[in-house]
Amino acid sequence: LRDRPEHMLEISPKGTVPVMLLPNGEVIEESLEIMQYVLNWELNDDETYWIDRNDNEFKYHLDRYKYPNRFENVDFIQQRDLAKRYLDDLDSYLSDSLPTRLSDALFPFVRQFANHDRAWFDAQGWQNLHQWLDNNLVSDEFARCMKKYQQWHAGDEVAIFPTTE
């Protein structure tokens, strides 16, 4: 986000990623909404429950855990412990197979949390969560999604995503 394209800022002044500009000029600025649009995905009750908890509970504590200096009177250990409650529940839920789309929606946030203090994360007794995270990290899909691209400029060749490389 250090070198945001001018066109991106024109269509989405908030300047955060992701941004999807549709042919009709509509702009979609939320990851989940982009996933729903591209995959024609209507959330079921279970998916809604987990995504709501992720967005309204876990991400709140994740931000304060990772960036305590951005907030007043925040104890990052307390925030980590509050986020842990969600992860405890997710670990239990993961004893069943997590639907792929839901997994893809939750994974980036759990990855951020894990990477903030990997030694602490790995020391937790989350057998299912650790296996799920590790499986995602070594997947071909993750490798394709994390491929680095040069910043696109008007006139450049169109990049089709995801690549099949």
Regions found by a protein language model. Give the residues of each.
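GST-like domain detector, emphasizing the conserved glutathione-binding G-site
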Residues: 1-85, 91, 98
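GST superfamily/GST-like fold recognition
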Residues: 98-125, 130
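Residues lining hydrophobic/aromatic ligand-binding pockets adjacent to catalytic sites
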Residues: 72-78, 119-124, 137
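Surface-exposed helix-capping loop/turn segments at secondary-structure junctions
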Residues: 92-99, 141-146
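Hydrophobic/aromatic-lined pockets within catalytic cores
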Residues: 39-43, 70, 95, 109-110, ...
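Acidic/histidine-enriched, glycine/proline-rich intrinsically disordered or flexible terminal extensions
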Residues: 149-165
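Short, hydrophobic secondary-structure boundary micro-motifs
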Residues: 62, 122, 143-147
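C-terminal end-helix/capping segment
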Residues: 125-142
